Amino acid sequence: MGLEARGLQKSFWQRRVVDDVSLVINPGEVVGLLGPNGAGKTTTFYMVVGLLPPDRGRILLDGDDITDLPMYRRSRRGIGYLPQESSVFRKLTVEENLLAILETLDLTARERGERLTGLLRELSLEGLAKQRAYTLSGGERRRLEITRALISSPSFLLLDEPFTGIDPIAIAEIQGIVSRLKQKSIGVLITDHNVRETLEITDRSY
């Protein structure tokens, strides 16, 4: 069982940009979706995420057809998404950014506090907890974004260009985080123009 795309097709203005693409992401597996500009990788990625509907083909999650489910319902089914664009609240602190998501869950104040402490520790954000998001470096912000995406305890995490705009040290940190996600049996799909950095951590790539 896992996250699967079968026979995806997509055309824009009578030009087919994705033609019969299939892929599978298993739990605890890191998969790359790579290719040059114009190869259709971003379009394929967006169809898996739920940002674009396919013209043909299906998206399956653990054997269930989720092709027609909107993005928020896919999230409830365990598919997390980290967009390339910054998704943090810039004027809030790191811990306030996390609490903003935690408060949408059915948790007591004590449970929220415990989850917050665990999340800050897990991705080494304790020292940044009181810092406002707009003061973070690119790598620190990316760590915060991944932490926010993990709050809903996804089974699969889809990362759009996670290595773009960050320095080599931050890239190594993100690679380490992805490896830890794999150890927790979270399936990860990465699309990125940084082919070498992506191939260093993927089990296989399309």
Enumerate the predicted regions with their spans.
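Helix-to-loop junction immediately C-terminal to a conserved catalytic motif
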Residues: 49
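ABC ATPase NBD coupling module
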Residues: 65-80, 85, 90, 109-113
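Conserved ABC ATPase signature
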Residues: 132-136, 140
